[in-house]
Amino acid sequence: KSLDKMREEDITMLQPDDDEVFADINEDEFAPYYRNEKQAKIMITTRPRPSKFVFTFIQDLLELFPRCFYYPRKTFSLKQIVEFSEKKNFTHIIVLNEKDKVCNQMIVTHLPYGPTAHYKVTNIVNSCSIAGHGRADLHKPEVVLNNFNTRLGLRVGRLFGSMFSHEPEFRGRQVATFHNQRDFIFVRYHRYMFEEKKARPNKTQIVGEDGKTAVMVATQELGPRFTLKLKWLQAGTFDTKEGEFEWIHKQHEHGKNDRKRFYL
């Protein structure tokens, strides 16, 4: 059996008939984005004095998230950045930290009242390193949020979903996927490609039941590719000293060898 099938029972798992959950999401801070009443505007910044290597990842994120803009951190505090962002009508901030010239942390906050999520970042593959990668265009992508099955997972997934338009432009055939598996969130960006299935030499052309030529669907990865793991979720914006934590990962409480317990 896989670890997914041996997963410990969790009382916070979502149920299809849970009216309380559906009532909550209709009134939460992300609801206006899902009702297309509000569009995200995202700022990306870094730690002070970032290395040049993190800028390749930033460029990829600018193509992944619509209406996303990079601002140099300089010497500003996070509190000053939040105040500036609110004045400029930003709805989200992404802050990237790094170690040994590799991005290793990502903080995502929703303005003006949170929540704020802190992720460990691993396995970054920039677009330029993906064989046969495509280039994203200006069409608004679809967003797929997969396997966020607990109340915490729903909250994390809705935070990601609020960063995208919910009126995707299907003509662009672009899809941003956030797939949760065992509390690791795999982020991918693809384009669908449709091709008529050609007949082999001396063979009859393949047709569907409607008499039309069969069409094959393939995907082209646009990049970037990376993995996130949630470290904590806070109710407000950037206050690790006095802020209220909705959830925090504590290794000694969860158990180092507890491989069957997942939280998203």
What is each PLM-predicted segment?
Residues 1-264:
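Phospho-regulatory, Ser/Thr- and acidic-rich intrinsically disordered linkers and terminal tails
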